[in-house]
UniProtKB/Swiss-Prot annotation:
Residues 18-45 are annotated as: Disordered. Residues 18-33 have a biased composition (Basic and acidic residues). Pathway: Secondary metabolite biosynthesis; terpenoid biosynthesis; Mycotoxin biosynthesis. It comes from Penicillium polonicum. Part of the gene cluster that mediates the biosynthesis of the neurotoxin verrucosidin, a methylated alpha-pyrone polyketide that inhibits oxidative phosphorylation in mitochondria and thereby causes neurological diseases. The carbon backbone of verrucosidin is synthesized by the HR-PKS verA, and further modified by the other verrucodidin cluster enzymes. PANTHER family: ILP IS AN APOPTOSIS INHIBITOR (PTHR42087), PTHR42087:SF2. GO terms for biological process: terpenoid biosynthetic process. InterPro entries: Verrucosidin_biosynth-assoc. This is Verrucosidin biosynthesis cluster protein U3. The lineage of its organism: Eukaryota, Fungi, Dikarya, Ascomycota, Pezizomycotina.
Amino acid sequence: MTNILRLFALVPGSVEQDAERISDRRDRSHEEGMTNPEAQSVLNDAEFGRVDPTGWFPHYKNCVQHFVDYSQHTPQVQSIAAFINIRLPCQRPSESSAPMSESTPSSFVSLRPYIRRLIVTAQDSPTVMQGFFGGDWEAGVGCIYKQERVNYMFTAKSSGWASTKAAYDISPDEETPFLRPLRDPSEDEIRVAEARWSEWLAMEDWMVGARSPW
């Protein structure tokens, strides 16, 4: 009976502590949004979450075409893909015996899994990105590249090593062989991630719409 009473005595304090923690986090998010003059401009950065489809998509298609028709067949790209344990489109099983260009149109190939794997293994140097996706890679996949680098920071911040690795594994046999810290992050890139993280904390506490600190 004494133990039960002690347990009940602890519950109100726990609830109060949780409420204080949530309140503190809300205040912190609000203060960061209001005191950081760069937060508003960062959160309004159109390049991070939105693109002009008419201007961006032709460049993206160029990158897909380069990857499917040319770079995936080069020894350099094949060796990197083997090292980071990800199959190229030409290495994936197909139900059709027709050539890749006929059986799997380039428009059906997603570049995002390759960008993600290059980032988490720190193989995403400009030289490698150009080797995979062509000279137009910054205009074509640059926005995806920025998104996924921030996503990697978020994943590492919100979970441990095993969970982070699992998030980037591709079933059944293309597991991420290793994880490396983000390659050469700039101060601006870190500030963008910090602002986005504060925005996410606000979302967790329903500080959106009229309640948003920004």
